[in-house]
């Protein structure tokens, strides 16, 4: 049985004061929650501080990006080994903001995926379509293309102990969200697409939903059979809102 994962992506937000307060509040809010894995991905400059405050808790540490190189003359980059050394476990790659603002290709993201697997870290592979692609009926084709970049280079086995986050671009930070039925249909397509290569791998892969997940819509989303948690943006910056989402995932998957 798949174990749900709710992960907070802090994006370009944070300060030492915020890390101190938010991690303390999260520890308090989530101390009694079982049945759902939890992770947060602060900016890389605050990973060490967050790790210190999360010590002894069930909240895992994540990161928002990784470079394809392990070392060398690559100014400003952070390697998989550095993230592993500092204690990060879940690493976000392929986020639409990276694809859009940094022009990251499917092939480049597949390289990042490979580097993370080699380092025994867990990739959180973000995929999803734009509003125009959605309106043109291309959602499945876009998701398949983004997954195939990894499947074709690394094979289905690479998705063992891996997370996929379906994030429709039109729903990220917009207040819009796919309906539970819409999201479930895409999640099922993703799982079925991987199952064409390896059914057992497809069955165990965690598929999160992302895109304006909040306290109001979380519970209904998580009742869907192929939605295994969430990658949460803005709501992860408030302990009470994030905790509601985590608790909704834990309750939905236990019932």
From Swiss-Prot:
<dbReference type="GO" id="GO:0019563">
    <property type="term" value="P:glycerol catabolic process"/>
</dbReference>
<comment type="similarity">
    <text>Belongs to the triosephosphate isomerase family.</text>
</comment>
<comment type="subunit">
    <text>Homodimer.</text>
</comment>
<feature type="binding site">
    <location>
        <begin position="9"/>
        <end position="11"/>
    </location>
    <ligand>
        <name>substrate</name>
    </ligand>
</feature>
<dbReference type="InterPro" id="IPR013785">
    <property type="entry name" value="Aldolase_TIM"/>
</dbReference>
<dbReference type="InterPro" id="IPR000652">
    <property type="entry name" value="Triosephosphate_isomerase"/>
</dbReference>
<protein>
    <recommendedName>
        <fullName>Triosephosphate isomerase</fullName>
        <ecNumber>5.3.1.1</ecNumber>
    </recommendedName>
</protein>
<comment type="pathway">
    <text>Carbohydrate biosynthesis; gluconeogenesis.</text>
</comment>
<keyword id="KW-0963">Cytoplasm</keyword>
<dbReference type="GO" id="GO:0046166">
    <property type="term" value="P:glyceraldehyde-3-phosphate biosynthetic process"/>
</dbReference>
<dbReference type="InterPro" id="IPR022896">
    <property type="entry name" value="TrioseP_Isoase_bac/euk"/>
</dbReference>
<comment type="pathway">
    <text>Carbohydrate degradation; glycolysis; D-glyceraldehyde 3-phosphate from glycerone phosphate: step 1/1.</text>
</comment>
<feature type="active site" description="Electrophile">
    <location>
        <position position="95"/>
    </location>
</feature>
<dbReference type="GO" id="GO:0006094">
    <property type="term" value="P:gluconeogenesis"/>
</dbReference>
<feature type="binding site">
    <location>
        <position position="212"/>
    </location>
    <ligand>
        <name>substrate</name>
    </ligand>
</feature>
<comment type="function">
    <text>Involved in the gluconeogenesis. Catalyzes stereospecifically the conversion of dihydroxyacetone phosphate (DHAP) to D-glyceraldehyde-3-phosphate (G3P).</text>
</comment>
<keyword id="KW-0312">Gluconeogenesis</keyword>
<dbReference type="GO" id="GO:0005829">
    <property type="term" value="C:cytosol"/>
</dbReference>
<feature type="active site" description="Proton acceptor">
    <location>
        <position position="167"/>
    </location>
</feature>
<dbReference type="InterPro" id="IPR035990">
    <property type="entry name" value="TIM_sf"/>
</dbReference>
<feature type="binding site">
    <location>
        <begin position="233"/>
        <end position="234"/>
    </location>
    <ligand>
        <name>substrate</name>
    </ligand>
</feature>
<dbReference type="Pfam" id="PF00121">
    <property type="entry name" value="TIM"/>
</dbReference>
<keyword id="KW-0324">Glycolysis</keyword>
<feature type="binding site">
    <location>
        <position position="173"/>
    </location>
    <ligand>
        <name>substrate</name>
    </ligand>
</feature>
<dbReference type="InterPro" id="IPR020861">
    <property type="entry name" value="Triosephosphate_isomerase_AS"/>
</dbReference>
<dbReference type="GO" id="GO:0004807">
    <property type="term" value="F:triose-phosphate isomerase activity"/>
</dbReference>
<dbReference type="GO" id="GO:0006096">
    <property type="term" value="P:glycolytic process"/>
</dbReference>
<keyword id="KW-0413">Isomerase</keyword>
